[in-house]
UniProtKB/Swiss-Prot annotation:
Residues forming coiled coils: none
Subcellular location: Virion
Family affiliation: Belongs to the DNA polymerase type-X family.
Keyword Transferase annotated: yes
Broadest EC class assigned to this enzyme: transferase
Name under which the protein is recorded: Probable DNA polymerase family X
Keyword set, alphabetical order: DNA damage, DNA repair, DNA replication, DNA synthesis, DNA-binding, DNA-directed DNA polymerase, Lyase, Nucleotidyltransferase, Transferase, Virion
A Pfam family it matches: HHH_8
Stored SUPFAM superfamilies: DNA polymerase beta, N-terminal domain-like (SSF47802), Nucleotidyltransferase (SSF81301), PsbU/PolX domain-like (SSF81585)
EC number: 2.7.7.7
Its job: Repair polymerase.
Keyword Lyase among record annotations: yes
Top-level taxon in the UniProt lineage: Viruses
Length: 354
């Protein structure tokens, strides 16, 4: 459905992404900022177009949908009338295009974000993954452990994880948690919880009803409790499920790589959450980002603060008073919003619900 429109917008996204990367190479901050916003807008419009449940026969069919602006409507009109976008053209020389593709490589390395890629380019003249490996070998540049692991698994880690595989991993993770303590529970959040068919990584929350606050969680021995999180990470490592650590913050957070049976290596994050923060943490880590942003804005308008730890009311002295939020629905209602199920939140990201 709408395949021609989606095809042209996919090509436009690639072109603007190339322009964005080129502005980084040229160290043109003004162009970089402009292209970053252009890219974000096109990505949003493309996501909405891919999730429409009707055929567009007139550009005005999508008028009024959040995320679809006048520029998008104009482009759709052009595609419907001519079959293509005239914005699309070869903007760079073969040499420049090769350089841009090298930077795209860098940003595909786990641990390298936009700012790090820009630093590698501007300060060290690194233009590709091969350049980076050589620079590390010769001692020209030093990088973090997470980037070293990203290079180790570059081309090996696959990010499109089928839902069926995550469901099997969820059963394994839950089973291993219950072996440590029957009340130790896990929830896989992110796009998986929103019902998507594939996910980029595995985002796990863990909780125990007796560990209500960070005090019990970080210092379990003081409350006659077991160090559940550390025991859990050790157990998954011994079983060969966790194969490499990016970071391990005892009693709190693990980031690393996992492998389930004969499936490819995957990225996984496991966070231990205080039980009193379970609802806001589930809300935050389920996403999508657009909804989180809207809800934080709604909280701010009500002189509240919303984050993954809770919903707080600020008193006249500036102190943050936590509100009673036993469920995600409590948070929606406290902000004057209708409750959205995790599946509805995925529709929110595509513009079908707002």
């Amino acid at each position: 459905m709408n395949s021609k429109i989606i095809e042209q917008f996919n090509l436009l996204e690639k072109q603007v992404d190339a322009e964005y990367l080129n502005s980084k190479v040229e160290n043109d901050l003004k162009e970089e900022t402009m292209n970053r916003f252009r890219l974000k807008s096109i990505k949003k419009a493309l996501s909405i177009l891919k999730n429409l449940d009707f055929e567009i026969t007139d550009a005005n069919d999508v008028k009024g949908i959040p995320g679809i602006g006048a520029g998008t409507i104009k482009r759709i009109k052009e595609i419907l009338e001519t079959g293509k976008l005239h914005d699309l053209k070869d903007k760079f020389s073969p040499e420049k295009q090769k350089q841009i593709e090298g930077i795209q490589e860098l940003e595909n390395v786990i641990g390298i974000g936009s700012s790090t890629a820009k630093k590698l380019i501007s300060q060290y003249g690194i233009r590709s993954v091969d350049d980076l490996k050589k620079a590390i070998e010769t001692g020209k540049v030093k990088v973090s452990t997470s980037i070293m692991l990203g290079l180790k698994y570059y081309g090996i880690v696959q990010r499109d994880i089928p839902r069926k595989e995550i469901t099997a991993i969820e059963k394994l993770l839950s089973k291993e948690a219950h072996k440590i303590d029957p009340d130790l529970e896990i929830i896989i959040c992110g796009s998986y919880r929103r019902g998507k068919k594939t996910s980029g990584d595995i985002d796990v929350l863990m909780y125990h009803p007796k560990m209500k606050t960070s005090k019990e969680m970080l210092h379990p021995e003081k409350f006659d409790l077991e160090p559940y999180f550390n025991l859990y990470i050790d157990r998954l490592t011994e079983k060969g499920f966790l194969i490499d650590d990016i970071t391990f913050n005892p009693n709190k957070k693990y980031m690393g790589f996992c492998k389930y049976k004969l499936n490819p290596v995957r990225r996984i994050d496991i966070r231990f959450i205080p039980y009193n923060s379970l609802a806001p943490a589930m809300l935050y880590f389920t996403g999508p980002m657009e909804l989180n942003t809207k809800m934080r804005s709604a909280a701010k308008k009500r002189k509240m603060i919303l984050n993954e730890y809770g919903l707080f009311k600020t008193d006249k002295n500036g102190a943050q008073i936590p509100l009673d939020t036993k469920s995600e629905a409590d948070i929606f209602h406290a902000l004057g919003m209708d409750y959205l199920t995790p599946q509805q939140r995925e529709l929110y990201s595509s513009g079908k619900i707002h």
